């Protein structure tokens, strides 16, 4: 079920982008928006892959329910990131992103908190490890973004999140980890 929700999340990202391109409207792209799409795509696969460590666990309903919360929030964030059913001939992704940023970044911060605690709650990793710095950094950037309407900040923040996610990949998935 968790994998299905992640697959639907990725499908939402693809559908959102394809919808913009197929409709024949003039799209004004915004680097921060494009990078957030990439960040969501990357985080979806990273978290899905990290769930491999739970394969030997004896699951109960509470664990399963908790395990569904993060992917469900991810699906919601992936659905929200791209405009749907626009009635105008012009789509400005900068304006759109700034309009949804409070909800989007709030959901993103909360889903990262849920992702941060599944390993410690399920007993597969300690509460404090190198990944918490990565996760807390992204949560902090998201919280700052909720309150900022500065386009440059959001571009820098989306680049920062991408770089931090890449650092997290090296921490989490290096051989021997």
Where is each model-derived feature located?
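Hydrophobic, membrane-inserted alpha-helices
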Residues: 114-115, 137-145, 162-165
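Hydrophobic transmembrane alpha-helical segments in integral membrane proteins
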Residues: 1-9, 176-177
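Membrane-proximal helix-loop-helix units in multi-pass membrane proteins
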Residues: 67-136
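Juxtamembrane boundary at the C-terminal end of a transmembrane helix
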Residues: 167-177
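A generic, lipid-embedded transmembrane alpha helix
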Residues: 31-54
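Membrane-interface helix-boundary motifs at transmembrane edges
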Residues: 19-33, 55-59, 87-97, 146-157
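Alpha-helical transmembrane segments
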Residues: 1-4, 57-75
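Central hydrophobic cores of alpha-helical transmembrane segments
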Residues: 35-36, 155-167
């Amino acid at each position: 079920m968790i994998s299905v929700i992640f697959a639907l999340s990725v499908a939402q990202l693809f559908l959102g982008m394809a919808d913009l391109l197929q409709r024949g409207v003039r799209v004004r792209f915004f680097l921060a928006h494009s990078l957030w799409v990439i960040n969501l795509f990357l985080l979806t696969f990273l978290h899905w892959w990290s769930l491999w460590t739970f394969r030997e666990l004896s699951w109960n309903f509470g664990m399963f329910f908790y395990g569904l919360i993060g992917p469900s929030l991810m699906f919601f964030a992936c659905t929200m990131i791209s405009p749907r059913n626009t009635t105008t001939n012009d789509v400005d992704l900068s304006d759109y992103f700034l309009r949804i940023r409070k909800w989007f970044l709030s959901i993103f911060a909360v889903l990262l908190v849920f992702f941060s605690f599944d390993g410690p709650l399920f007993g597969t990793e300690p509460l404090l490890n190198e990944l918490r710095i990565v996760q807390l950094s992204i949560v902090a950037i998201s919280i700052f973004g909720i309150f900022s309407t500065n386009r440059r900040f959001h571009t820098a923040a989306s680049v920062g999140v991408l770089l931090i996610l890449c650092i997290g990949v090296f921490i989490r998935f290096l051989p021997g980890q």
